[in-house]
Amino acid sequence: MAATDFVQEMRAVGERLLLKLQRLPQAEPVEIVAFSVIILFTATVLLLLLIACSCCCTHCCCPERRGRKVQVQPTPP
């Protein structure tokens, strides 16, 4: 039951976003700037999330862990 409610809510949000995009050419400059700021903020957050995930997955910030050191013993003559 909750899954269908979620799908319907996402569809409603998508339809509202599409309606806003269709009305954007006739919108006032303040609305265009506000919409642009929201889109830019969302894109920035998604980009930073992608960078953080890729750095975490590639371990570029962490030094490579080395195995245990083994002492070398001299060989008898």
UniProtKB/Swiss-Prot annotation:
Gene Ontology CC, one term: membrane
Alphabetized InterPro entries for the sequence: SMIM5 (IPR047133), SMIM5/18/22 (IPR031671)
Primary subcellular site in the record, as a coarse category: membrane
Listed transmembrane segments: 32-52
Keyword ATP-binding: no
Keywords noted in UniProt: Membrane, Transmembrane, Transmembrane helix
CDD domains in alphabetical order: CASIMO1_SMIM5 (cd20254)
Cellular compartment(s): Membrane
Membrane-topology descriptor: Single-pass membrane protein
PANTHER family named among the record's database cross-references: SMALL INTEGRAL MEMBRANE PROTEIN 5 (PTHR37344:SF1)
UniProt-recorded name of the protein: Small integral membrane protein 5
Chain's gene name: SMIM5
